C-alpha cells in the first residue's frame, strides 16, 4: 500500500500533523480534512485515489459517525476511527455503522 493515498480527518491540527509526518515517512500520500464537512468534500473529490480513511469521532460541523454513514452509502473503503473516548458502546456503535477498526 506504499504510495497510496490516506485521508486523515481530525479537528486537532497537531494530531493531523503527527499522523501526516509519520505516514508520509512511510511512503504514503496524505490528504487532510479538519472537520466532517471538509472530509466529505475531500472524499468526493478523491474517492478513486483514497485507499484508507483515518477518521476522528468528535469534530465540529459534522461528527465522525455522520461522515462514516455518508461514506458507507457510497463506498466500502476501509475506515479506522480515531477517538479519545474508550467506551465500549462507542466501539460497538462504530462497528454497527461499518467501521473497520
Regions found by a protein language model. Give the residues of each.
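Conserved phosphotransfer cores of two-component systems
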Residues: 44-48, 70-77, 97
Amino acid at each position: 500500500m506504499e504510495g497510496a493515498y490516506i485521508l486523515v480527518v481530525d479537528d486537532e491540527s497537531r494530531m493531523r500533523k503527527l499522523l501526516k509526518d509519520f505516514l508520509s515517512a512511510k511512503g504514503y500520500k496524505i490528504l487532510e480534512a479538519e472537520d466532517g464537512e471538509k472530509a466529505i468534500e475531500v472524499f468526493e473529490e478523491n474517492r478513486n485515489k483514497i485507499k484508507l480513511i483515518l477518521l476522528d469521532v468528535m469534530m465540529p460541523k459534522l461528527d465522525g459517525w455522520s461522515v462514516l454513514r455518508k461514506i458507507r452509502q457510497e463506498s466500502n473503503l476501509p475506515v479506522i476511527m480515531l477517538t479519545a473516548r474508550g467506551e465500549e458502546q462507542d466501539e460497538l456503535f462504530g462497528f454497527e455503522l461499518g467501521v473497520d477498526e
